Amino acid sequence: MLLLLLLLLLGPGPGFSEATRRSHVYKRGLLELAGTLDCVGPRSPMAYMNYGCYCGLGGHGEPRDAIDWCCYHHDCCYSRAQDAGCSPKLDRYPWKCMDHHILCGPAENKCQELLCRCDEELAYCLAGTEYHLKYLFFPSILCEKDSPKCN
């Protein structure tokens, strides 16, 4: 059963074929974040649903590894976008996936541009990391209360 769970988490993203990853135009919701992660790869977006102290909903404490730092910086990026009047989890933006590369735009407003850049940075950041199973389903109680400050 654990092996099946790991294959689902670390295998190809659900609902995204190789052709979809190569060339497709998306509109955003939270599912679009998953699309950008799947476009760049190498793991399923599900692999980050509950990882470390920052990947998934919420976040606090000291990031545990490079993946967790990517998610922390993404949270900071979403906070900056929210401060600029955007709704990161609801606002939509146009983008394309071309040969595993994210192409943002054409943006109709600043929020679309900001949010696509946040998701793009996360996707490329995660692509260069090593995955540590010990941080999958990491108990949030083990994350400290104090968080690093966003830049």
Curated annotation (Swiss-Prot):
Q: InterPro entries, from UniProt?
A: PLipase_A2 (IPR001211), PLipase_A2_Asp_AS (IPR033112), PLipase_A2_dom (IPR016090), PLipase_A2_dom_sf (IPR036444), PLipase_A2_His_AS (IPR033113)
What EC number(s) does this enzyme carry? 3.1.1.4
Binding of Ca(2+): at which residues?
A: Y54, G56, G58, D75
Q: What class of enzyme is it?
A: hydrolase
Catalytic activity of the protein: a 1,2-diacyl-sn-glycero-3-phosphocholine + H2O = a 1-acyl-sn-glycero-3-phosphocholine + a fatty acid + H(+); 1-hexadecanoyl-2-(9Z-octadecenoyl)-sn-glycero-3-phosphocholine + H2O = 1-hexadecanoyl-sn-glycero-3-phosphocholine + (9Z)-octadecenoate + H(+); 1-octadecanoyl-2-(5Z,8Z,11Z,14Z-eicosatetraenoyl)-sn-glycero-3-phosphocholine + H2O = 1-octadecanoyl-sn-glycero-3-phosphocholine + (5Z,8Z,11Z,14Z)-eicosatetraenoate + H(+); 1,2-dihexadecanoyl-sn-glycero-3-phosphocholine + H2O = 1-hexadecanoyl-sn-glycero-3-phosphocholine + hexadecanoate + H(+)
In this entry the propeptide is located at 18-28
Q: List the disulfide bonds.
A: C39-C97, C53-C143, C55-C71, C70-C125, C76-C150, C77-C118, C86-C111, C104-C116
Instruction: Please name the SUPFAM superfamilies in this protein's record.
Output: Phospholipase A2, PLA2 (SSF48619)
Q: Which GO terms describe its biological process?
A: arachidonate secretion; axon guidance; cellular response to leukemia inhibitory factor; cholesterol homeostasis; defense response to virus; erythrocyte maturation; fertilization; hair follicle morphogenesis
Instruction: Name the organs or tissues of expression.
Output: Expressed at high levels in testis and the gastrointestinal tract including stomach and colon. Expressed at lower levels in other tissues including small intestine, uterus, oviduct, lung, thymus, spleen and brain. Expressed in Paneth-like secretory epithelial cells of the colon. Expressed in gastric and ileac epithelial cells and in glandular epithelium of intestinal mucosa (at protein level). Expressed in late spermatogenic cells, spermatocytes and spermatids, but not spermatogonia in seminiferous tubules (at protein level).
Q: What coarse category fits the chief subcellular location reported for this protein? A: secreted
- Provide the Gene Ontology terms for cellular component: acrosomal vesicle; extracellular space; lysosome
Q: What induces it?
A: Up-regulated in alveolar macrophages upon allergen-induced airway inflammation. Up-regulated in bronchoalveolar lavage fluid (BALF) in response to house dust mite proteolytic allergens.
Pfam families the record matches: Phospholip_A2_1
Q: Active-site positions, per UniProt? A: H74, D119
Tell me what happens on changing H74Q. Impaired acrosome reaction
Q: What happens when the gene is disrupted?
A: Mutant male mice have reduced fertility due to deficient acrosome reaction. Mutant mice are lean and protected from age-related adiposity and fatty liver. Mutant mice show resistance to allergen-induced asthma, with marked reduction of inflammatory cell recruitment in the lungs, reduced goblet cell metaplasia, smooth muscle cell layer thickening and subepithelial fibrosis and impaired mucus hypersecretion. This resistance to allergen-induced inflammation is associated with deficient T helper type 2 immune response and decreased eicosanoid synthesis.
State the needed cofactors, names only: Ca(2+)
Signal peptide bounds: 1-17
Localisation:
Secreted; Lysosome; Cytoplasmic vesicle, Secretory vesicle, Acrosome
The UniProt subunit note reads as follows:
Interacts with PLA2R1; this interaction mediates PLA2G10 clearance and inactivation.
Q: Which family does it belong to?
A: Belongs to the phospholipase A2 family.
Give a short account of what the protein does: Secretory calcium-dependent phospholipase A2 that primarily targets extracellular phospholipids. Hydrolyzes the ester bond of the fatty acyl group attached at sn-2 position of phospholipids with preference for phosphatidylcholines and phosphatidylglycerols over phosphatidylethanolamines. Preferentially releases sn-2 omega-6 and omega-3 polyunsaturated fatty acyl (PUFA) chains over saturated fatty acyls. Contributes to phospholipid remodeling of very low-density lipoprotein (VLDL), low-density lipoprotein (LDL) and high-density lipoprotein (HDL) particles.
Protein name as annotated: Group 10 secretory phospholipase A2
Q: Which organism is it from?
A: Mus musculus (Mouse)
* Gene from which the chain derives: Pla2g10
